[in-house]
Amino acid sequence: RNWPWFKRLIGASFLRHAKHQPFKEIIIDADHPSTSFLPKLWQRDDECYFFKEYNPDIRVLIVHDLGPLDDKDKPTYYGGNSSPSVWCHEFDGGRQWYTSLGHDIATYATAEFQQHIMGGIIWVVGNNKPLDYRKAHAKTPNDPLPY
């Protein structure tokens, strides 16, 4: 938890979460594969996670609408009544995508949330060329794979 490299990779540190309840997510960046198909205001029934120690290099994709949230201890952020909930960034030679949503089985059963997750995975993988596994063989057990 106190490993600075890991905090920069993840993009923030967990602070706390509100009780499970309905709230809205605001799509900030609709050009990302994990958000491009979502409505501008995305109604959720989930736990609203709060974070601290944000990496300034993250690209915020979605924020929580904190205004109507039922939570007497909700912190006040520089963004006012919003708080980042989904973000991504390029980091240390790779890519990272994070969603703070998805705390029950019903959420993962929806096609919309599955597409959200798949869009994040697609972005992380990027435009890598597929490997030709026909070339992945060794003549002896100690030979390196030729790809």
Residue ranges and their predicted role:
Residues 5-7, 44, 89, 125:
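Intrinsic disorder/low-complexity segments enriched in polar/charged and small flexible residues
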Residues 68-86, 90-147:
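Extracellular ligand-binding/catalytic regions of CAZymes and related secreted enzymes
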Residues 7, 35, 118-122:
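Non-transmembrane alpha-helical segments in soluble domains
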Residues 12-92:
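Catalytic beta-strand/loop cores that center a nucleophilic Ser/Cys/Thr
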Residues 1-14:
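Helix-loop-strand module that forms the ligand-binding subsite of alpha/beta enzymes
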